[in-house]
């Protein structure tokens, strides 16, 4: 019986992981299709599509799925014309700032759901500009130090004009201005294959909480991310794996 119980637990966990992965894939496919619809299916000339495809690859989306999403967006159907991009500024419990990016075909549904999730978890919507000033739009390029020597990445990144470089564990992050992101990422790509390359909102300062407070905020963020219309939740929470 114990073996059966263990196997059932494994299956449930696998099912939950598969469901989460499918939800991520659905959001990525939508973003790829919209990007292709708006700027064409050529990755080289469509920077938004290039970033969306890169995210999909990092998430291990099958190549066929990516290609189908590009074809769907760059075809003659009406995808994209009925979708809207929405950005909400909000507060989680304990003053954590949130920027919630959505892609939806129904503004009222999205607004209602986002507001409901926030209010049920102790958060609240903010006015436009209430938290966005806490974040800076930057280029973010991440590499695995298991693949490349740290000193080589640093040397080339500084030569390319990177603003900042951070390394932690087996990852190194190169920060650029939003304006120079494309040029710098292309320059570095001649020698290194990045794990992540995107325009990101980076908090000027991060907010530290105790474990109980942090878990409450992370639970809210997860609930928001579980909503299909939410593409991304940016926050200024300092996430610490273990708090004594």
From Swiss-Prot:
Family: Belongs to the TACO1 family.
Pfam families for the chain: TACO1_YebC_N (PF20772), Transcrip_reg (PF01709)
InterPro entries per record: Integrase-like_N, TACO1_YebC-like_2nd/3rd_dom, TACO1_YebC_N, Transcrip_reg_TACO1-like, Transcrip_reg_TACO1-like_dom3, YebC-like
GO biological process, one term: regulation of DNA-templated transcription
NCBIfam families: PRK00110.1, PRK12378.1, YebC/PmpR family DNA-binding transcriptional regulator
Coiled-coil features, chain-numbered ranges: none
Name used for this protein in its record: Probable transcriptional regulatory protein BT0025
Domain of life, per lineage: Bacteria
Keyword DNA-binding assigned: yes
Compartment(s) of residence: Cytoplasm
HAMAP family: Transcrip_reg_TACO1
Keyword annotations: Cytoplasm, DNA-binding, Transcription, Transcription regulation
């Amino acid at each position: 019986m114990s073996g059966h119980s263990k196997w059932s637990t494994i299956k449930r966990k696998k099912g939950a992981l598969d469901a989460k992965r499918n939800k991520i894939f659905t959001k990525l496919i939508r973003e790829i299709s919209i990007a292709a619809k708006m700027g064409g299916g050529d990755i080289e000339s469509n920077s938004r599509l290039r970033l969306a495809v890169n995210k999909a690859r990092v998430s291990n989306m099958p190549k066929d799925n990516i290609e189908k999403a590009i074809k769907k967006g760059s075809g003659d159907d009406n995808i994209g014309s009925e979708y809207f991009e929405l950005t909400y500024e909000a507060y989680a419990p304990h003053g954590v700032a949130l920027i919630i990016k959505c892609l939806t075909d129904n503004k009222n549904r999205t607004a209602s759901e986002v507001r409901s999730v926030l209010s049920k978890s102790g958060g609240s919507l903010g006015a436009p500009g209430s938290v966005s000033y806490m974040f800076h739009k930057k280029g973010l390029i991440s590499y695995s130090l298991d693949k490349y020597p740290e000193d080589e990445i640093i040397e080339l990144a500084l030569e390319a004009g990177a603003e900042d470089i951070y390394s932690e564990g087996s990852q190194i992050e190169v920060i650029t201005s939003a304006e120079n992101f494309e040029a710098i990422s292309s320059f570095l790509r001649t020698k290194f294959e990045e794990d992540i390359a995107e325009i990101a909102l980076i908090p000027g300062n991060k907010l530290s909480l105790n474990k109980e407070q942090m878990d409450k905020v992370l639970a809210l963020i997860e609930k928001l991310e579980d909503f299909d219309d939410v593409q991304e939740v940016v926050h200024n929470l300092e996430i610490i794996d273990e708090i004594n």
